[in-house]
């Protein structure tokens, strides 16, 4: 019995109460008084089972209180800790900084009892009263396996006790003591493994409360910065779109979790908790109305919806069914509000499953919700740099300080496009969810198609931005080859025109000007264009044909674009109108310059016709050195030949020949 004594040293002092039928027709109750019966003589055979196991071995262990207060019957402590975890949360309690902490020592999850054995060395496998504890080498995890089947032990002990009733031998007491130990360990293991889903649920619930607090704290920082922002600039719009999308997704996750949890709740208790914490179900129905616009008012409405659903979710956890299905109190008014708020809910969907499986299902659902909430928190945490860039510009600040402050905004040009795409995605999701009537299908399909088209345009724009560098380089490499290039300003034959030998022309592309993301950066980088003077170029061969051309691209901007601050004050309509005027101005100047260059080249061709005869004579004469100018004349003839027979001058050459032929026929 030394091994049995060691085992009960591990168990410690347990005081529990139980009333059970071990033999079917007799109640077994163990009392704490000493047994005065002697081991040799048993006067009453029926008193064998009723006799407490005491003084089996003198001076070893007192087994009188072994079956007192078995905890497998009562779940009061679990429900109390569950209620304390929910009620003491900051979402239901405004004075949460005054709450009393719940230490692990006072929790039902404290399994670290006073164990004096195996403290000095690490054991890879330890037999305990809760099962066989094994340690994995690779994963470094502990695994608890059940080594006693409660039903088999119960049947075996019952059959042995039935045979021992007619046995009066001395060894009967020793056999009876071993049977009681095995029966007690079977009760303990059955209780623990039945309670394990509740322990897991309570752990996941506390983790969910922590994640909700983290998400709420970082979300409030975003809301505070939006409220103090005076002007909605580019960064403010990005914050608004990001916060709107994340808030909408979080509200939908809370909504679906609350709707699923209603199947496990007691509606009578839920109505009482909603009354205690001031949850207005009529207001909740108004906040669930579908919203198709993205405004500041809608954002605050979504925030109110999240606060309501968060409180409602905790009240649902407080009113979870706990073996009291007969104690339901029907509330017709409250059930009507629930049907309006959750159309998929019906009272027939209440879960009637076993108590243990109920907590395991809820634990699995909370794990999935915690993963989604962690993802939303990580998105807000990664973009928290946007919070510190919404300050408005002061008058004393210079343009250099402004560029330094908004420098990080242009590192990733696709960020705003991705935020817009995320907004379009959640609008499509909202349309799909809000379809209820058959009459609204056509209108809803049109709205969904519009959102999908906008999303496709955003994706194409994002792809064009990523591939703009490679396309630009390929376009310039193709100019170096032979062929007829139709763009006069970027023709490869410009190097033969003297007017382009001493100046450089740089323009703002129309595509770049139409891009709102790059327009501000272009203007802020070139803010000194008003101090540039025009450069005059005179063509010697045209005898005084002077014209003016600017060397800086920003000279084509209007006065309203001189300062970047004025640009940010323009609304969408004004910016679009200015942009159209700018495009028209560039088109007019481009057409004018093309006409001037075409006229200049035509004059050059007419002058080259007068030298055609001299060119033929130069070709017939093999000795170029006989001419007066010698080598210089040879180089000039080669230049004139290359200029005359270049691919770009061929159309003009045929036009002149047709003109001369028509003049001769007249």
From Swiss-Prot:
A Gene Ontology cellular-component term: peroxisomal membrane
Main location: membrane
Keywords: Glycoprotein, Membrane, Peroxisome, Receptor, Transmembrane, Transmembrane helix
Glycoprotein keyword on record: yes
InterPro entries, per the entry: INP2
Bilayer-crossing regions: 171-187
Function as written in the Swiss-Prot or TrEMBL entry: Required for peroxisome inheritance.
Protein name listed in UniProt: Inheritance of peroxisomes protein 2
